[in-house]
Amino acid sequence: MAAEEEEVDSADTGERSGWLTGWLPTWCPTSISHLKEAEEKMLKCVPCTYKKEPVRISNGNKIWTLKFSHNISNKTPLVLLHGFGGGLGLWALNFGDLCTNRPVYAFDLLGFGRSSRPRFDSDAEEVENQFVESIEEWRCALGLDKMILLGHNLGGFLAAAYSLKYPSRVNHLILVEPWGFPERPDLADQDRPIPVWIRALGAALTPFNPLAGLRIAGPFGLSLVQRLRPDFKRKYSSMFEDDTVTEYIYHCNVQTPSGETAFKNMTIPYGWAKRPMLQRIGKMHPDIPVSVIFGARSCIDGNSGTSIQSLRPHSYVKTIAILGAGHYVYADQPEEFNQKVKEICDTVD
């Protein structure tokens, strides 16, 4: 369904510098216009009206935002934070159900999608703080008092980090297959040690961003996404029969690698967090309820919910498993996911 309004074409793309980023537009068949068109295709089947706008924050940056049912004033708004390599368009299967009786906001994280793509610090703690402050500035700009904050993957990590720093703004924290919670296990403690060749490959790739290969592939990048992740087309088959989803993912991830670089600076080899959230979540304000949603078929460690419960013994923590779902639980089983999220939201108001 078409948006009700759009104030400007898009958020700024941020700085481009160096020979590589200057060369990318001529090698990769992409542009901000391509990303805009891909997003519009993702959203055209959303069965409800919405408004979209770039929300201005500090340093000239903008956060690309969708607003659903924003005129409902008696319910706490639900705010959706996407994961690494994603964008707000990936919630297309969820918007219609989630906004039936409360405001829903979704935005592209700073450095991702159609939000600004600034330079991030190289220090993991400072990068995390830059993300958190961008969320807080976004909240202030929209005049939201309190939120139900839901994050998937990297978005879950950032939602938890935000809740630690700004507890008075979060009425409920919903972690969906969150990244970055456990510490990296010692190699000697692993049941199946990482093969030497994988460790060598990991060391060789350390200087590069996680999705650099997609940009290096240039005009072959889109077919690479389609070949490596055919599951995304299947997940959204009820909404799209063509390659809309893989095209959106491709154009999200071959722009200037701003958020991607930030994520790399927050990780150690093999994708573990430099600053694991389980080391800190016990310090979260005890009055913030936490719900953890994971897919029963996910390859990601699903024990974070149990760990959070043990670290917050006197606070509300609930773990919910979605049968038949993997890591992208909101797309694998959207109806069940939407229902569980609505039930959680109804406990707030």
UniProtKB/Swiss-Prot annotation:
Changing E260K: In CDS; loss of PNPLA2-dependent triacylclycerol hydrolysis but no effect on LPA acyltransferase activity. Widely expressed in various tissues, including lymphocytes, liver, skeletal muscle and brain. Expressed by upper epidermal layers and dermal fibroblasts in skin, hepatocytes and neurons (at protein level). The HXXXXD motif is essential for acyltransferase activity and may constitute the binding site for the phosphate moiety of the glycerol-3-phosphate. This is 1-acylglycerol-3-phosphate O-acyltransferase ABHD5. It comes from Homo sapiens (Human). Belongs to the peptidase S33 family. ABHD4/ABHD5 subfamily. Induction: Up-regulated upon keratinocyte differentiation (at protein level). It catalyses: a 1-acyl-sn-glycero-3-phosphate + an acyl-CoA = a 1,2-diacyl-sn-glycero-3-phosphate + CoA; 1-(9Z-octadecenoyl)-sn-glycero-3-phosphate + hexadecanoyl-CoA = 1-(9Z)-octadecenoyl-2-hexadecanoyl-sn-glycero-3-phosphate + CoA; 1-(9Z-octadecenoyl)-sn-glycero-3-phosphate + octadecanoyl-CoA = 1-(9Z-octadecenoyl)-2-octadecanoyl-sn-glycero-3-phosphate + CoA; 1-(9Z-octadecenoyl)-sn-glycero-3-phosphate + (9Z)-octadecenoyl-CoA = 1,2-di-(9Z-octadecenoyl)-sn-glycero-3-phosphate + CoA. Its EC number is 2.3.1.51. GO terms for cellular component: cytosol; intracellular membrane-bounded organelle; lipid droplet; mitochondrion; nucleoplasm. A motif (HXXXXD motif) lies at residues 327-332. It is linked to Chanarin-Dorfman syndrome: An autosomal recessive inborn error of lipid metabolism with multisystemic accumulation of triglycerides although plasma concentrations are normal. Clinical characteristics are congenital generalized ichthyosis, vacuolated leukocytes, hepatomegaly, myopathy, cataracts, neurosensory hearing loss and developmental delay. The disorder presents at birth with generalized, fine, white scaling of the skin and a variable degree of erythema resembling non-bullous congenital ichthyosiform erythroderma. Keywords: Acetylation, Acyltransferase, Cataract, Cytoplasm, Deafness, Differentiation, Disease variant, Fatty acid metabolism, Ichthyosis, Lipid biosynthesis, Lipid droplet, Lipid metabolism, Phospholipid biosynthesis, Phospholipid metabolism, Phosphoprotein, Transferase. PANTHER family: 1-ACYLGLYCEROL-3-PHOSPHATE O-ACYLTRANSFERASE ABHD5, RE40534P-RELATED. Coenzyme A-dependent lysophosphatidic acid acyltransferase that catalyzes the transfer of an acyl group on a lysophosphatidic acid. Functions preferentially with 1-oleoyl-lysophosphatidic acid followed by 1-palmitoyl-lysophosphatidic acid, 1-stearoyl-lysophosphatidic acid and 1-arachidonoyl-lysophosphatidic acid as lipid acceptor. Functions preferentially with arachidonoyl-CoA followed by oleoyl-CoA as acyl group donors. Functions in phosphatidic acid biosynthesis. May regulate the cellular storage of triacylglycerol through activation of the phospholipase PNPLA2. The modification Phosphoserine is found at S122. It is found in: Cytoplasm; Lipid droplet; Cytoplasm, Cytosol. Residues 77-184 form the AB hydrolase-1 domain. It comes from the Eukaryota. Signal peptide: none annotated. Acyltransferase activity is inhibited by detergents such as Triton X-100 and 3-[(3-cholamidopropyl)dimethylammonio]-1-propanesulfonate (CHAPS). Acyltransferase activity is inhibited by the presence of magnesium and calcium. Interacts with ADRP, PLIN and PNPLA2. Interacts with PLIN5; promotes interaction with PNPLA2.
